[in-house]
Amino acid sequence: VITNKKAYKADMVILSAGIRPNTAFLEGSGLEMFKGTILTNEQGETNLSDIYAAGDCAMVHNAITGKPAWSPMGSTANISGRLIAQNIMGAKLGYRGVLGTAVCKLPGMNVGRTGLTEEQAALEGFHPVSVITVVDDKAHYFPGAGSFVIKMIADRDSLRLLGVQVIGAGGVDKVVDIAVTGIMLKGTLTDLADMDLAYAPPFSTAIHPFEHTLNVLMNKINGKFDTFTPAEYAQGAAEGYKVVDACLTPSIAGAPYVDLTTVEGPVEGLDPEEKILLVCNKGKRAYLLQNRLKFYGYQNTKVLEGG
């Protein structure tokens, strides 16, 4: 990459220039603006009589918070444009708002998100709780099977679903779209549990990745799954904990290894009173080991979410 100052070697170049509303021509029109966007109400009307605005130039609102939100997406433009057309013809329809839903295809993986992040949820007055899972994207024995890494955020008090982020080689958009449906209907984790989602080995797992993550989050909320998130671990929350390798085979250098299938009582070398951090490849075996250790009196265990 050659600039006016020097040349830079790179393995990959990402052009992320961003966009901005092209509304300079509206200066002096009397339209109420905010940072170059046209402010509208739920019907798509501006502050000027009989003038509507839609698309990348128009500000809409967030469906969860009700606050103004800029969503320069083709989907938003088409949905709000159709609504405005109906309102011009006499309807009185209100736009329900956006969730910041997005999907992106990267080399070898896909990324998607919708709703609030954990940080945004806290700023909006929710009591957020989240979980990170690593789950199969289809039956593990089926050709082309891979994994999703999913983060799900909900309000701890009401159990309302607030957001989802997912990355993986498979169809992340389906996980995102299920979450969008739940969030737009103000659904709780209880409302969305045990849904009869499409299943066949080429397409999904018997318990859908979305439902699997929801179940894990409910276990965490109900105190059945004691964890550190990767963020908590990075901030030093696991200081003073003994790391225990719970992988299928020994995989963590310097950490004592415990084979889940052999635990039938207290584990030699592990004090039931000490703080123990259980780590495996994806978090599942560590969770199963945590349950066994709890049964045998180990009450100070944590699992590293996501492995």
Task: Give the ranges of each region predicted by the language model.
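Mid-to-C-terminal Rossmann-like scaffold of FAD/NAD(P)H-dependent oxidoreductases
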Residues: C57-G170, P202-T205, P209-G236, Y241
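Rhodanese-like catalytic fold shared by cysteine-dependent sulfurtransferases
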Residues: D191-P201, T205, H212-P230, Q235-K242, ...
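Short, well-ordered alpha-helices that flank and scaffold nucleotide-derived cofactor binding pockets
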Residues: Q86, G90, T181, N291-F295
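Conserved beta-strand-loop-beta-strand element in the redox core of flavoprotein oxidoreductases
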Residues: V1-A7
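FAD-site-proximal beta/loop scaffold in flavoenzymes
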Residues: A7-L83, A179-G182
